[in-house]
């Protein structure tokens, strides 16, 4: 069958539904899985796209594809909590091996196209990747600010950590996202959802 590799790929990436993340969903009832996170950031990218800096230089379809594939590596590498300093060590290398295997299920040129998009996202240098990264980083912040922030309070996440890992990544993408970052930070600090430091 001509599309067998595509079917093999889509069946393989179904495993993303089984990758549990640290963040809780919006009703605070359970942890989200990575497939749910991917879906949510794809929607968020579309609704925040009008606010992206220099959005005429951004290809929204490329951003959507980037967001839909960038976490597929978690099928093999697992979800690494952004504020887990030990877990973050070697993350890129683990995920690069996973990317080669997972995208390698597909034939060329799609295998290389997906791998290159994944690398572009990780490098955060192009307008598409900067916007995609901002979307990926702001979504957990939104969830934590509007819930009990269990994933952050359980880990003792500090204001300094959030500023170091999220502020530039989010704020450089949009003036409105910069404003949102400040409002979310204030909400988290007022609600004691972060350790002040």
Regions found by a protein language model. Give the residues of each.
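Alpha-helical, largely C-terminal catalytic domains
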Residues: 1-197
């Amino acid at each position: 069958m001509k599309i067998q590799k595509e079917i093999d790929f889509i069946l393989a990436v179904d495993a993303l539904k089984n990758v549990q993340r640290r963040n809780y969903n919006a009703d605070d009832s359970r942890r989200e899985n990575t497939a749910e996170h991917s879906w949510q950031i794809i929607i968020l990218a579309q609704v925040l796209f009008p606010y992206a800096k220099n959005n005429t230089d951004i290809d929204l379809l490329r951003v959507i594809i980037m967001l839909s594939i960038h976490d597929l590596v978690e099928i093999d590498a697992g979800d690494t909590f952004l504020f887990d300093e030990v877990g973050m060590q070697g993350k890129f290398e683990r995920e690069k091996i996973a990317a080669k295997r997972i995208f390698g299920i597909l034939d060329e040129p799609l295998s290389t196209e997906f791998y290159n998009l994944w690398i572009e996202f990780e490098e955060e240098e192009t307008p598409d990747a900067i916007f995609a990264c901002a979307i990926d980083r702001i979504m957990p912040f939104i969830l934590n600010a509007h819930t009990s922030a269990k994933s952050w309070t359980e880990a003792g996440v500090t204001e300094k950590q959030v500023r170091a890992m999220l502020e530039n990544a989010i704020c450089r993408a949009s003036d409105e996202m910069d404003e949102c970052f400040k409002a979310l930070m204030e909400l988290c600090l007022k609600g004691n959802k972060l350790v002040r430091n």
